[in-house]
Protein backbone atom coordinates (compact mmCIF):
# COMPACT_ATOMS: atom_id res chain seq x y z
CA UNK A 1 0.00 0.00 0.00
CA UNK A 2 1.00 3.60 -0.58
CA UNK A 3 0.80 4.58 3.10
CA UNK A 4 2.51 1.71 4.97
CA UNK A 5 6.06 0.70 5.81
CA UNK A 6 5.69 -2.26 3.48
CA UNK A 7 8.98 -4.13 3.80
CA UNK A 8 8.71 -4.24 7.63
CA UNK A 9 10.94 -2.47 10.12
CA UNK A 10 12.91 -5.64 10.85
CA UNK A 11 13.80 -6.05 7.16
CA UNK A 12 15.74 -2.77 7.32
CA UNK A 13 18.56 -4.68 9.03
CA UNK A 14 19.00 -6.82 5.89
CA UNK A 15 19.16 -3.88 3.49
CA UNK A 16 22.34 -3.23 1.51
CA UNK A 17 21.10 -0.01 -0.12
CA UNK A 18 18.63 2.54 1.23
CA UNK A 19 17.16 5.56 -0.55
CA UNK A 20 15.71 8.22 1.78
CA UNK A 21 13.29 10.64 0.09
CA UNK A 22 12.25 13.71 2.07
CA UNK A 23 12.82 11.93 5.36
CA UNK A 24 15.01 12.40 8.43
CA UNK A 25 14.70 9.09 10.30
CA UNK A 26 16.99 10.25 13.12
CA UNK A 27 14.40 12.90 13.98
CA UNK A 28 11.20 11.20 12.82
CA UNK A 29 11.78 7.60 13.98
CA UNK A 30 14.79 7.08 16.24
CA UNK A 31 14.28 3.30 16.63
CA UNK A 32 14.13 2.87 12.86
CA UNK A 33 17.21 5.06 12.53
CA UNK A 34 19.09 2.77 14.93
CA UNK A 35 18.32 -0.15 12.61
CA UNK A 36 19.56 1.84 9.61
CA UNK A 37 22.80 2.57 11.45
CA UNK A 38 23.10 -1.12 12.36
CA UNK A 39 22.79 -2.25 8.74
CA UNK A 40 25.17 0.52 7.67
CA UNK A 41 27.80 -0.90 10.03
CA UNK A 42 27.13 -4.63 9.53
CA UNK A 43 26.19 -4.76 5.83
CA UNK A 44 28.22 -1.84 4.49
CA UNK A 45 24.84 -0.48 3.40
CA UNK A 46 24.92 2.35 0.85
CA UNK A 47 22.61 5.20 1.82
CA UNK A 48 21.44 7.99 -0.47
CA UNK A 49 19.11 10.88 0.26
CA UNK A 50 16.92 13.19 -1.77
CA UNK A 51 16.51 16.44 0.16
CA UNK A 52 18.58 18.79 2.33
CA UNK A 53 21.75 17.69 4.14
CA UNK A 54 20.96 15.89 7.38
CA UNK A 55 22.78 15.36 10.68
CA UNK A 56 22.73 11.56 10.61
CA UNK A 57 24.96 9.18 12.57
CA UNK A 58 26.11 7.33 9.44
CA UNK A 59 27.56 8.35 6.11
CA UNK A 60 25.33 9.00 3.12
CA UNK A 61 25.36 10.40 -0.40
CA UNK A 62 23.22 13.46 -1.07
CA UNK A 63 21.97 12.73 -4.57
CA UNK A 64 19.99 15.93 -4.94
CA UNK A 65 18.57 18.62 -2.67
CA UNK A 66 15.62 18.79 -5.05
CA UNK A 67 13.01 16.12 -5.60
CA UNK A 68 13.76 16.43 -9.31
CA UNK A 69 16.71 14.13 -8.58
CA UNK A 70 14.24 11.24 -8.37
CA UNK A 71 13.98 11.20 -12.16
CA UNK A 72 17.77 10.79 -12.42
CA UNK A 73 17.54 7.74 -10.15
CA UNK A 74 14.65 6.32 -12.17
CA UNK A 75 16.71 6.68 -15.35
CA UNK A 76 19.86 5.33 -13.62
CA UNK A 77 21.88 8.49 -14.25
CA UNK A 78 23.62 8.72 -10.85
CA UNK A 79 26.34 6.72 -9.12
CA UNK A 80 24.00 5.88 -6.25
CA UNK A 81 21.29 4.58 -8.59
CA UNK A 82 23.81 2.08 -9.95
CA UNK A 83 24.42 0.85 -6.39
CA UNK A 84 20.67 0.78 -5.75
CA UNK A 85 19.78 -1.31 -8.80
CA UNK A 86 22.73 -3.69 -8.40
CA UNK A 87 22.15 -4.41 -4.69
CA UNK A 88 20.36 -7.53 -3.44
CA UNK A 89 18.11 -6.04 -0.75
CA UNK A 90 17.46 -2.36 -1.50
CA UNK A 91 14.61 -0.40 0.10
CA UNK A 92 13.13 3.06 -0.34
CA UNK A 93 11.90 5.16 2.59
CA UNK A 94 9.68 8.13 1.73
CA UNK A 95 8.83 10.77 4.34
CA UNK A 96 5.38 12.32 4.52
CA UNK A 97 6.96 15.78 4.17
CA UNK A 98 7.74 14.80 0.57
CA UNK A 99 4.26 13.58 -0.33
CA UNK A 100 2.11 16.02 1.68
CA UNK A 101 2.56 18.63 -1.05
CA UNK A 102 0.89 19.56 -4.32
CA UNK A 103 3.46 17.34 -6.06
CA UNK A 104 2.99 14.47 -3.63
CA UNK A 105 1.13 12.20 -6.04
CA UNK A 106 3.82 12.62 -8.71
CA UNK A 107 6.61 11.99 -6.19
CA UNK A 108 4.94 8.83 -4.93
CA UNK A 109 4.39 7.65 -8.51
CA UNK A 110 8.09 8.05 -9.40
CA UNK A 111 9.14 6.29 -6.18
CA UNK A 112 6.80 3.45 -7.07
CA UNK A 113 8.35 3.16 -10.54
CA UNK A 114 11.82 3.04 -8.99
CA UNK A 115 10.66 0.33 -6.55
CA UNK A 116 9.35 -1.83 -9.41
CA UNK A 117 12.80 -1.74 -11.03
CA UNK A 118 14.55 -3.01 -7.89
CA UNK A 119 15.73 -6.65 -7.93
CA UNK A 120 13.80 -7.69 -4.80
CA UNK A 121 10.42 -6.30 -5.90
CA UNK A 122 7.81 -9.07 -6.09
CA UNK A 123 4.21 -9.90 -5.25
CA UNK A 124 5.34 -10.94 -1.77
CA UNK A 125 7.80 -8.11 -1.08
CA UNK A 126 7.41 -4.37 -1.62
CA UNK A 127 10.61 -2.33 -1.04
CA UNK A 128 8.71 0.99 -1.07
CA UNK A 129 8.07 2.28 2.47
CA UNK A 130 6.20 5.33 3.73
CA UNK A 131 7.44 6.74 7.04
CA UNK A 132 4.39 8.40 8.59
CA UNK A 133 5.09 11.02 11.24
CA UNK A 134 1.56 10.92 12.67
CA UNK A 135 1.15 7.99 15.01
CA UNK A 136 -2.48 7.28 14.04
CA UNK A 137 -2.20 7.94 10.28
CA UNK A 138 -1.89 4.31 9.12
CA UNK A 139 -4.77 3.15 11.31
CA UNK A 140 -6.98 6.00 10.09
CA UNK A 141 -6.27 5.23 6.44
CA UNK A 142 -6.85 1.52 7.05
CA UNK A 143 -10.32 2.40 8.38
CA UNK A 144 -11.00 4.54 5.32
CA UNK A 145 -10.69 8.03 6.81
CA UNK A 146 -9.77 10.01 3.70
CA UNK A 147 -10.85 13.34 2.26
CA UNK A 148 -9.43 14.47 -1.06
CA UNK A 149 -11.01 17.91 -0.60
CA UNK A 150 -8.08 18.81 1.65
CA UNK A 151 -5.22 17.67 -0.59
CA UNK A 152 -2.33 20.11 -0.99
CA UNK A 153 -2.26 23.11 1.34
CA UNK A 154 -4.39 21.81 4.20
CA UNK A 155 -4.75 25.00 6.26
CA UNK A 156 -5.73 27.20 3.31
CA UNK A 157 -8.43 24.73 2.24
CA UNK A 158 -9.58 24.36 5.85
CA UNK A 159 -10.04 28.14 6.11
CA UNK A 160 -12.03 28.13 2.87
CA UNK A 161 -14.27 25.30 4.12
CA UNK A 162 -14.93 27.01 7.48
CA UNK A 163 -15.61 30.38 5.84
CA UNK A 164 -18.09 28.77 3.45
CA UNK A 165 -20.00 26.38 5.74
CA UNK A 166 -19.39 27.53 9.37
CA UNK A 167 -19.18 23.89 10.53
CA UNK A 168 -18.84 22.20 13.90
CA UNK A 169 -15.20 21.03 14.09
CA UNK A 170 -14.17 18.04 16.20
CA UNK A 171 -10.46 18.08 17.09
CA UNK A 172 -9.44 14.57 18.09
CA UNK A 173 -6.27 15.41 20.00
CA UNK A 174 -5.05 17.56 17.12
CA UNK A 175 -2.69 20.36 18.14
CA UNK A 176 -0.47 20.86 15.09
CA UNK A 177 -2.73 23.16 13.06
CA UNK A 178 -2.92 26.93 13.53
CA UNK A 179 -5.96 27.66 15.71
CA UNK A 180 -6.64 30.82 13.66
CA UNK A 181 -7.64 28.49 10.81
CA UNK A 182 -10.65 27.52 12.93
CA UNK A 183 -12.04 31.06 13.26
CA UNK A 184 -15.76 31.08 12.50
CA UNK A 185 -16.40 27.47 13.52
CA UNK A 186 -17.69 25.84 16.70
CA UNK A 187 -14.80 23.77 18.05
CA UNK A 188 -15.14 20.65 20.20
CA UNK A 189 -11.79 19.33 21.48
CA UNK A 190 -11.30 15.70 22.49
CA UNK A 191 -7.88 14.96 23.94
CA UNK A 192 -5.72 14.57 27.02
CA UNK A 193 -2.87 17.09 26.74
CA UNK A 194 -4.80 20.36 26.67
CA UNK A 195 -2.46 22.12 24.27
CA UNK A 196 -3.06 25.43 22.52
CA UNK A 197 -6.06 24.38 20.43
CA UNK A 198 -7.81 23.04 23.53
CA UNK A 199 -7.48 26.50 25.05
CA UNK A 200 -9.39 27.99 22.12
CA UNK A 201 -12.10 25.31 21.95
CA UNK A 202 -15.75 26.04 22.74
CA UNK A 203 -16.19 22.65 24.42
CA UNK A 204 -13.45 20.42 25.89
CA UNK A 205 -14.10 16.71 26.36
CA UNK A 206 -11.14 15.19 28.27
CA UNK A 207 -10.16 11.69 27.16
CA UNK A 208 -7.77 9.16 28.73
CA UNK A 209 -4.16 8.97 27.60
CA UNK A 210 -3.06 5.74 25.92
CA UNK A 211 -1.61 4.55 29.25
CA UNK A 212 -5.06 4.90 30.84
CA UNK A 213 -7.02 2.55 28.58
CA UNK A 214 -6.75 -0.83 26.91
CA UNK A 215 -6.63 -0.15 23.20
CA UNK A 216 -5.85 -1.45 19.75
CA UNK A 217 -3.28 0.47 17.71
CA UNK A 218 -1.71 0.01 14.31
CA UNK A 219 1.99 0.70 13.71
CA UNK A 220 3.58 2.12 10.56
CA UNK A 221 3.73 -1.39 9.06
CA UNK A 222 -0.04 -1.74 9.38
CA UNK A 223 0.46 -4.38 12.09
CA UNK A 224 -2.12 -4.46 14.88
CA UNK A 225 -0.80 -3.91 18.41
CA UNK A 226 -2.84 -4.22 21.61
CA UNK A 227 -2.08 -2.39 24.84
CA UNK A 228 -3.25 -2.81 28.43
CA UNK A 229 -4.23 -0.05 30.82
CA UNK A 230 -1.60 0.94 33.40
CA UNK A 231 -3.96 2.91 35.65
CA UNK A 232 -7.41 4.44 35.64
CA UNK A 233 -8.06 7.78 33.88
CA UNK A 234 -7.37 10.90 35.91
CA UNK A 235 -9.83 13.70 36.63
CA UNK A 236 -12.91 13.88 34.42
CA UNK A 237 -11.42 11.93 31.50
CA UNK A 238 -13.75 9.37 29.93
CA UNK A 239 -13.35 6.89 27.08
Q: Where are the language model's segments positioned?
A:
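Non-catalytic alpha/beta scaffold blocks inside enzyme catalytic domains
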Residues: 1-239
Amino acid sequence: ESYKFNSSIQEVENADAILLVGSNPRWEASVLNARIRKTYINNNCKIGIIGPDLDLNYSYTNISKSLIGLNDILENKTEFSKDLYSSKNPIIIVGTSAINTNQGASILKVCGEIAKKLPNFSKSFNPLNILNQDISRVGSLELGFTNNNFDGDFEIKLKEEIKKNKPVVFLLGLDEINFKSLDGSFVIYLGHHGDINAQHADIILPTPAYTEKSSTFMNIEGRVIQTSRCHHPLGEAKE
